Amino acid sequence: MIEAKLWRAGRRKIEVGHVWRPAEPVRGDGAMGTREHAWLARGPKLYRMAMIDDATSRVGARWVESDSTGANLGMLEWWLRRSGRPQSFYTDKASLFRTAEKRRRDEPGVEKGAGEPPPTQIGRALRELNITWIGAHSPQAKGRIERFFQTAEDRLVKGLQAEGVKTLEQAHTYLEQEFLGWWEPTRTVKPASSDDAHRPLDQEHDLTAILSHVETRQVKNHYTLEFERRLYAIERTDMGTGLRGAAVRIEKRREGSLAIRFGEALPALPRA
């Protein structure tokens, strides 16, 4: 009938399934993610933040009340102090990791500007630690961290409900003692290679400074500077050559204190 042109064969649509990214052969690549879910049903709203080693599926996880820059930097610090610096770092393409200008430039057909847009605070910290950031194009590209969340949304939620967990403190206890205690022996695997590509934290890697909120300010003639609508004065005993009119690095630490860095770190800033 086709040859007689009495019937025309239609094109058959072939469904292409998602393919999970294969595991890395050696330890040293991490993936990080945050999942909002009704973890405690009628309890407080919580986010589940986790980081996983791509080769072994070893996990670090915590509850946070917001998916903020500070919370993500805290998760990163935990990983760095436990394992060292990973070679690369998979996340989604949220604004915490990639600026709006960077996202716009990455769109097809958008002309690339002459200069690279400034990184986010997390992007800057990764750059100072010499860790490559990789923005996953899909949940499947993040691999093991997405499968971890799939398991958590089933098994963890059921466990929290069965134990009657209602508070953040109770959720922390159950997560550490029960869920991660089950995950470690049952879900982690041996890597294809015994090598570990993590790199140690060197002397120049001051995590308190690197994992701060960092901005640049110019010192005025009277050795003052403005930050967050406040005026701060630098003590005369801390003044170094060339400080007047210089651009200095302001570090707002995660516990709230401020420090100024001009070559060497200076004491926390007093208000003018």
Feature roles, as predicted:
Residues 65-66, 92, 238:
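A generic structural motif
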Residues 1, 33, 51, 57, ...:
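Mobile genetic element proteins and their domesticated derivatives, centered on retroelements
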